[in-house]
Amino acid sequence: MNEQYSALRSNVSMLGKVLGETIKDALGEHILERVETIRKLSKSSRAGNDANRQELLTTLQNLSNDELLPVARAFSQFLNLANTAEQYHSISPKGEAASNPEVIARTLRKLKNQPELSEDTIKKAVESLSLELVLTAHPTEITRRTLIHKMVEVNACLKQLDNKDIADYEHNQLMRRLRQLIAQSWHTDEIRKLRPSPVDEAKWGFAVVENSLWQGVPNYLRELNEQLEENLGYKLPVEFVPVRFTSWMGGDRDGNPNVTADITRHVLLLSRWKATDLFLKDIQVLVSELSMVEATPELLALVGEEGAAEPYRYLMKNLRSRLMATQAWLEARLKGEELPKPEGLLTQNEELWEPLYACYQSLQACGMGIIANGDLLDTLRHVKCFGVPLVRIDIRQESTRHTEALGELTRYLGIGDYESWSEADKQAFLIRELNSKRPLLPRNWQPSAETREVLDTCQVIAEAPQGSIAAYVISMAKTPSDVLAVHLLLKEAGIGFAMPVAPLFETLDDLNNANDVMTQLLNIDWYRGLIQGKQMVMIGYSDSAKDAGVMAASWAQYQAQDALIKTCEKAGIELTLFHGRGGSIGRGGAPAHAALLSQPPGSLKGGLRVTEQGEMIRFKYGLPEITVSSLSLYTGAILEANLLPPPEPKESWRRIMDELSVISCDLYRGYVRENKDFVPYFRSATPEQELGKLPLGSRPAKRRPTGGVESLRAIPWIFAWTQNRLMLPAWLGAGTALQKVVEDGKQSELEAMCRDWPFFSTRLGMLEMVFAKADLWLAEYYDQRLVDKALWPLGKELRNLQEEDIKVVLAIANDSHLMADLPWIAESIQLRNIYTDPLNVLQAELLHRSRQAEKEGQEPDPRVEQALMVTIAGIAAGMRNTG
């Protein structure tokens, strides 16, 4: 194990040294000495030296305003470099990569060794694999794109330096390049000056496709194919591509007034433009590669006399011209010009697939399989995975917006006020209108701007090429009418096909009612006819945890999924559960493999659809090699969950979970909702107010400008508590509930649940990870610097709760210390703490100075504001998850 870390440690210290030289060159010896002193104090403070901890606090409190920014930047940049080294380590031959693509091989061997599974059953499970990753622009991706590109290049240098056979001069060149990249990063402002627009966010998503996924997906499929051939003697069919990408960037308007129908239209065009751009590069390669002459009669008939001399090239050149014409038309549309559609405009994937596949079949038939299975096969797989739209988009809107639009319409028509009708009356009206042949919307009606926006969005969906929009997600869905309302609005827009509409159940009550809502819908004949045996339902992780605490939320999510699976199975409906997980624990994030195997049996039968958020996209798909390893992990987990489903929990375990859920929810809400000191404490002990100033995402931090915790979005709520290291949303209530059940004499049952029930062991594992990242002396320091003395007892109470929680979790898991079974993660947290701690101390100091100045009516000092932003970004990098 330790040799594995020594390679990582030596890279981290080498990058740290280069950063130190850069700082010295830029700002002089004295700043570097100051940074080094702080680093050494932090290291010995972590090792338990209290005198040095005190000295660390004093040193950071005494920094002048001029020293604040360089010190904050030094530690923040160091953490970015450490993350880069760690990301490289996960794919390097000396690190974990030695074992990663092995995931699929290990899974296949495990499945083959099960007497009850035939090879045929395993093949069928492989062929029904379906994985859809939904990229969302959560404001949690704090790092600017400029710096991400530099870090990708640092990664490439580390890879080359690992090569034992490089000559000395090459080694020196690489070290010079590393110094240049680190100097460039140092002299670049790491904080965005302006909030990104939704279009900027979409471009960030396209950059991930271009820089990583475009190469990563075909590589993953080659890996999968090799493992299948080796273990099952089975080859993947050419057209089989189990992975798809969808995006919320430019489509998610829930609580984001900046995402309008025009923006969605623009992003759809931009996405198609980017697809033509990437396919043109592919086809250019094929034009030069496919110079072969021999072809099948079918192919020769396709190209005619004109193309007989070089049939493959002829087809590729034709395709190239169509792509160029399509690109030119899209470019004009993006500039706002209205042009007639050109001859041969590409709008459907089949138009790309057919000529490419004709070449593939001919090459195979003429004994040139080795050529067919090269770049041509990769391009065919690009068509299946990305196609004409590149990434499809989801539209997401809050349910009340549809209700208000229909209310305005019914009032105008003089048939009453839809908003005040009972659920039964709403349903009767909607079903009647859905069955009606006449339009409902009057021609000369002038609706309000809000309603106009809802109708325009439906218009965009109706006009978009079929297949470019994946689903319409309704957030805060509560009733069957919420789903029927969207179907009616889409029908009125003239949509010519059945668009998947997915209700998102995201509060504790809504999760508990989800099965009832879906049962009612499935009992409506019109609805059953429309959905053609398929239904998507989205499960909200972050809002339910914010509403009820993690323990109650995770049990409600489990039960809702369990009930929906059984209901749909009984009704003969194929259910796709769409998981809205975040990167952080309070928003449902967990290591993929563990998370998938902890879901109810049968939950992955309809495939996996999951959101990949903000900074997690970069950690999981930032490089082609990491993409291969992330997709392999998902593949292994889905196969295992479908073929070796976890056992149904025992009735007594369900009863214990019900009990834990009630106790933890009461305690959580007792603090968050009912304790009058809680909101003032939260506002002062965390940088919550200051976070709103960060130009992070395009979406406001609050759903409504005023109000308490409930109006705050789940992301800033979690982000704020991660900054002050109390990590409160990810544990509050859970440990207390466990302690109560232990006191009732059920510890041995809890231990059995931990051993034999993946759902429960994953929950405890996630709590351990949160406790490993939390830090009570830092949380206490924030209180001392920032919180009114009258509120100190509340902070102390919360910290004591966490200490008790850690003890009970370790007792149930039978561990002597946190993260005992995941030493790699424990090591990674320890490595970063030395650099994150000074940023936390500094942040508390900066918040103190900034709030003090505000109290005294002074203008905020820009040096303090800038340094504060840097600490926020740095701590986010140190915690490896933000919101």
Curated annotation (Swiss-Prot):
Example of a GO MF term: phosphoenolpyruvate carboxylase activity
Entry superkingdom: Bacteria
Catalysed transformations (reactions): oxaloacetate + phosphate = phosphoenolpyruvate + hydrogencarbonate
InterPro entries: PEP_COase, PEP_COase_bac/pln-type, PEP_COase_Lys_AS, PEPCASE_His_AS, Pyrv/PenolPyrv_kinase-like_dom
Cofactor(s) of this protein: Mg(2+)
Stored NCBIfam families: PRK00009.1
PANTHER family from the UniProt entry: PHOSPHOENOLPYRUVATE CARBOXYLASE (PTHR30523:SF6)
Annotated protein name in UniProt: Phosphoenolpyruvate carboxylase
Organism: Shigella flexneri serotype 5b (strain 8401)
Organism taxonomic ancestry: Bacteria, Pseudomonadati, Pseudomonadota, Gammaproteobacteria, Enterobacterales
Gene: ppc
